[in-house]
Amino acid sequence: MLSIQEIMALIPHRYPFLLVDRIMELEPGVRAVGEKLVSANEPYFQGHFPGNPIMPGVLILEALAQTGAVAALSAPENAGKLVLFAGIDGARFKRVVRPGDTLRLEVQLEKMRRGVGKGQARATVADQLACEAELLFALTDPSR
């Protein structure tokens, strides 16, 4: 399990854009399972949507991407690198995510070639599928 401090040591995201609260399972370079505790205080709920708060789908995808970045960057050979989003294929949203929900974020990394990788991602709430997608990412030197 990784704490928020350990997550922040791996990825550069910070409030209000750090969307993973903890990592419960980690196989470095292979897979990660994380959680986002969705609070009524999230800044995006002010406008999405007043009186009917729903977590934007793009932020669910970003939370999945950050979980995948933790999996990739926890591998010793990727230490000190930066993970950039390179694409999304087959994204599907099956359930709304609301304040009070705990979003479970699962990412399985599949391929890595010449600094470009792919992962299968799923987000669930109470064992119900909220989102699934194939995420594409690139590993790079942060000074570039």
UniProtKB/Swiss-Prot annotation:
It catalyses: a (3R)-hydroxyacyl-[ACP] = a (2E)-enoyl-[ACP] + H2O. Keywords: Cytoplasm, Lipid A biosynthesis, Lipid biosynthesis, Lipid metabolism, Lyase. SUPFAM superfamilies: Thioesterase/thiol ester dehydrase-isomerase. Its main location: cytoplasm. GO terms for cellular component: cytoplasm; membrane. InterPro entries: FabA_FabZ (IPR013114), FabZ (IPR010084), HotDog_dom_sf (IPR029069). The active site is at 48. GO terms for biological process: fatty acid biosynthetic process; lipid A biosynthetic process. It holds the Pfam family FabA. Its EC number is 4.2.1.59. It is found in: Cytoplasm. The keyword ATP-binding does not apply. The keyword Magnesium does not apply. One of its GO terms (molecular function) is (3R)-hydroxyacyl-[acyl-carrier-protein] dehydratase activity. HAMAP family: FabZ. PANTHER family: 3-HYDROXYACYL-[ACYL-CARRIER-PROTEIN] DEHYDRATASE (PTHR30272:SF1). Belongs to the thioester dehydratase family. FabZ subfamily. Involved in unsaturated fatty acids biosynthesis. Catalyzes the dehydration of short chain beta-hydroxyacyl-ACPs and long chain saturated and unsaturated beta-hydroxyacyl-ACPs. This is 3-hydroxyacyl-[acyl-carrier-protein] dehydratase FabZ. The lineage of its organism: Bacteria, Bacillati, Chloroflexota, Chloroflexia, Chloroflexales. The gene is fabZ.
